Amino acid sequence: MFEKYCNEKKYVFNAPLPEIFDFSVFEYAFAFWQWGEDINQIPASDTDDKKVFDYWINMCEPSYFTNYNATASFDVQAARELGYYGYYTKPFKKYLSIKAAKGYLKRLMVPKGAENVKFSPALYNHTVDFLTKNDPKMVYIYGDIDPWGASGIYGLPFTKNKKNLHVYMCPGGSHKARILSFPEPTRQEIINLISGWLKE
């Protein structure tokens, strides 16, 4: 089914299809929590293959692993400045066509001509330095089940005792967390904060 699907979509990958399949399977767990999916929607073990496949593909579209997708510019920035998450493959080695997932971002997703971009922590270091030494009027919003929150500033020492810098963690929030995602009192607090800044 996977091969047929990718052929029909005319996807071109920088790795053999079995490897793309492996990466798509690993992406499922990350995507599930990132987007705050409902565990009750996970197909039961006796669900027919087509329904399981459709559910999975809807969550982990393999075009994500092409190097010409809509996120190509972000992929380059991730490889150069931001870093990117990996997949823990060791417990699954006997089932995989890949030996390891290390370096998959540059190998699979960075556009041709940019594969050799070197990572530099300069932007990260500059950001942490700026936020440590300054108190900018900024609101950071995270969802508490979003794995991307692991790379955020929530709970870091430099966020304490700031008057203007505010960091909010949305209960049950995913990557889709927005101001409107928060319970009413917190939502209003954020709105009042930003409204006050706009009036200055």
Region annotations inferred by a language model:
Residues 1-119:
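Alpha/beta-hydrolase fold active-site neighborhood
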Residues 64-67, 124-130, 155:
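Generic recognition of flexible, low-complexity loop/linker segments
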Residues 70-72, 131-134, 158-162:
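Extracellular/periplasmic catalytic domains that process cell-envelope and extracellular macromolecules
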Residues 89-90, 147-152:
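Conserved alpha/beta-hydrolase "acid-adjacent" motif
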Residues 134, 140-142:
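Short beta-strand/loop motif that positions the catalytic acidic residue
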Residues 143-145, 153-175:
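Low-complexity, glycine/alanine/valine/leucine- and proline-rich hydrophobic stretches
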Residues 152-154, 181-182:
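Short coil/turn segments at secondary-structure boundaries
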Residues 169-200:
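Catalytic active-site module of serine/aspartate enzymes centered on a nucleophile-bearing elbow/loop
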